[in-house]
C-alpha cells in the first residue's frame, strides 16, 4: 500500500553524483533526447511523424514499468489468504490509473498524424519501418494477456511475410518468446479469469456483479474495463489512420509494405475484448449501450 505521507528521500544510485550540477537539461538528457529525431528527407511532415511515434514509445516504456508493478501487486493480492477472492489491491490501483492516463496520451497524440499533408514525400524513403515493429507495444500486449495474433500479419497474396515482419522476428523473436513464457500465468487477463473463478455466481454476469461489489476487486475491474476500452480504441484508430494515410498516397499497403487491413483488423476479430463480459456488463447495467 502506498505510504506517501511517510516517504523519505532516497540517495542517488550513483554515490559520486554532484546533485548541485544536476540541471534540467542534464537530468532529462535533453540534448540526447532531441538528437534521437533524425528525418531521412527534407519533408516538413517527417519530423512530426517521428516525434509522434517517439512520444508514444516513451509512453509505452513507462506503461510497461507500471504494468510490471500492477501485475506484481495483483499477484500478491491474489495470494493473500485473508480474503477468499482477493486481498488489498490499493498498491495495484495506485499504478493502474497511471497506465490508463498514459494510454490516453497515446490516443491523443496519434491523431496529430492526421494533420500531415505530405506523407508521400517520405513514405518510400523510410523503408521497411512499420508500427508492426514496435516491440514495446508487443511487450505491453503480452503483459495484458494478448495472444500472438500479429503472427503472419504482413503476408502478401502468395503467403510470404514482409521483411518488416521477418526482421522483427529475427531481432525480437527470442524476447517475444520469453515474454510469453514469463507472463503466461501473470497477466491482466489471467488475473481477471482468476477473479471470476473465485467469485460466487452461476453466470459470468453474476460473478462480475459480485466482484463489482467487493471492496478490493471492484477498483481492479473498473481499471481493467477502462484499459480494455482504451486498447480497443487504439486498434480502431490505428486502422482508421492507416486507411486515411494510404488514401493520400494511393496505395493499399502500410509503411514497410505491411498488409495493414488484415493485420490491424485481427485484434478486434481474434482478441477483443480482453476481459469478456466486463464492458458489456457495465453497458447493460448503465443502460448506455456499447459505444466502443
Region locations from a protein language model:
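Short, C-terminally biased terminal segments at protein or domain edges
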Residues: 283-292
